[in-house]
């Protein structure tokens, strides 16, 4: 099982601490260089949605209580290329003073391909690039997007030092700051929120055959063949893969993009938990099916770690053909409530003709 936990309770099975940056065959990698932000600043000074949320947070009574767990399994593959990370207290991990009441948590799943180096690298460094971004915490959405591209560029630098690191990974990260949930995705991992038993997808699968991605790929000089980007990759967005010819450009405008899509939601008392997982999970679980399964398990034992293991075990039973990794983040200390469905009120009506017939029948009884 592969897990990386940066502190906080409710972790997955084994291991702990921060994973090492991939070695360079006995050579020490240079310090990661910080590149200029790839995210353009808006021309006006309009405040971001997350900044407005923080200003008004004192007026909101609800505040989530986060606890998490994760689990991973090699599945039917011969090598393990998935990693995940759970940090229920991101600010404490990086020694940053909390700027708001409530949680400051970071979670991620990274599904490597062509080796595990890219997944390990992103798992080790993405959170740091977020926290150290000049726009954090004032504009978290912008900092989150920039951190993906910073990490991608830093991995390119690492690969230029040691070509054996060449590989790629999809990446999905979730931040819980106060009562704001931000999910950034590049690839085909998926995040699904359970809102009072209903599945709400917080990410979009980036497949080359998706019309929006296909248009972007072709505009960037690439093509889609048989569902594969340039006939080689079955994802349209990923970090790494700099070694693959024609995939990426230094300006970030190549067919294979590391820029994430970010979705934001203000959490309420009805939001129960979030599931983030690699495609090996979603190959055999529909989003609502996964929410229903996890909800039942949490009602039984209220343990996110055990819930993740049960999701992985069930995916293996359903013959998933990939590595498996999943993280469950609960937003309440209590288990999900049992939902009672009210009986529908049946409205009955009778026609005028039927009413006359009924009256005639009653009159006949009186006679």
Swiss-Prot record:
Pfam families: PP2C. Mn(2+) 1 binds at residues 111-112. Residues 7-18 have a biased composition (Gly residues). SUPFAM superfamilies: PP2C-like. Its cofactor is Mg(2+); Mn(2+). Keywords: Hydrolase, Magnesium, Manganese, Metal-binding, Protein phosphatase. Coiled coil: none annotated. Residues 1-29 are annotated as: Disordered. The keyword Iron-sulfur does not apply. One of its GO terms (molecular function) is metal ion binding. Mn(2+) 2 binds at residues 111, 279, 322. Residues 67-331 form the PPM-type phosphatase domain. It is an enzyme of class 3 (hydrolase). Binds 2 magnesium or manganese ions per subunit. SMART domains: PP2Cc. It comes from the Eukaryota. Its EC number is 3.1.3.16. CDD domains: PP2Cc. It catalyses: O-phospho-L-seryl-[protein] + H2O = L-seryl-[protein] + phosphate; O-phospho-L-threonyl-[protein] + H2O = L-threonyl-[protein] + phosphate. GO terms for cellular component: cytosol; nucleus. GO terms for biological process: regulation of defense response to virus; signal transduction. Belongs to the PP2C family. PANTHER family: PROTEIN PHOSPHATASE 2C (PTHR13832), PROTEIN PHOSPHATASE 2C 22-RELATED (PTHR13832:SF790). This is Probable protein phosphatase 2C 57. The lineage of its organism: Eukaryota, Viridiplantae, Streptophyta, Embryophyta, Tracheophyta.
